Amino acid sequence: MNVFSYLLDPAHWTGPQGIPMRLAEHVYYTALTLLFALVIAVPIGAWIGHTGRGGFLVVGLANGLRALPTLGLLVLIVGATGLGLIGPITALVILAVPPILAGTYAGLRNVDPAVVDAARGMGMRGREVLLGVELPNALPLIISGIRSSVLQVISTATIAAYVALGGLGRFIIDGLAVRDFPQMIAGSLLVAMLAVAADLLLAGLQKLVVSPGLRAAPGPRRLRVVPSKTPDAAHAA
């Protein structure tokens, strides 16, 4: 049986071990990981980027976490927590945080200081500047970090199969156990296709949420103030 025969076999598209179920499990692991990573990385990156304090920590932390071997980290966490979802998700979150953290920090630090000064001159307070000016103008780099994180998580979520969980990694691990190479290659192709589909989806989302001016003219010198209808701003105007 070759790879295409394996993928086209109706028996592999039904049941709890079929391709749709494994795909849904893989997407679930990825979405759960991304949710935790966003909750952790975006506020920290935004605060550091806004205040300018601790930037060296972002660089050091991002590089340090990226250097950790995910599989080795998974073994350590599973040894402490036991089998289950906690180990793989924790390992994947540690992998997913650095790109988002670095993208958020870099995005805010690249906002033109003149734009921020203009916003403050309009009477906007610190939080209003962060939410109404800096974060919207930092979206291109933030979303780029998210895209990088998602690709890494999708490709690495196959480690969940090492601790008896599901996902597309089951095709690779189970195929390796019985030397079923078509199954292993099919699993790898499915992971790659999912990664490409997710990246295209996020690219489309980026076009929707990022203003055309920021897409056409990236760079701090062309960033703009996002209009804000705050009472202080209206009064200052």
Regions found by a protein language model. Give the residues of each.
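C-terminal transmembrane helix and the adjacent membrane-cytosol boundary/short C-terminal tail
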Residues: G52, R109, P113, A186-A237
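Membrane-embedded alpha-helices of multi-pass transport/permease systems
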Residues: V39-I44, G87-V116, L139, I146-A157, ...
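Cytoplasmic-entry segments and transmembrane alpha-helices of multi-pass inner-membrane transporters
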Residues: I44-I77, L92, A102-N110, D117
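Glycine-rich helix-loop "coupling/hinge" segments at transmembrane-helix boundaries
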Residues: G79, T156-I185, L189-V191, V210, ...
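Loop-to-helix entry region at the N-terminal start of transmembrane alpha-helices
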Residues: M21-T30, V78-P99, L139, Q183, ...
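Transmembrane alpha-helices
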Residues: A31, I94, R127-I159, P182, ...
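Periplasmic/extracellular loop-to-transmembrane helix junction in inner-membrane transport proteins
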Residues: M1-L34
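Short cytoplasmic-facing helical segments at TM-TM junctions of multi-pass membrane proteins
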Residues: G103-I142, L168
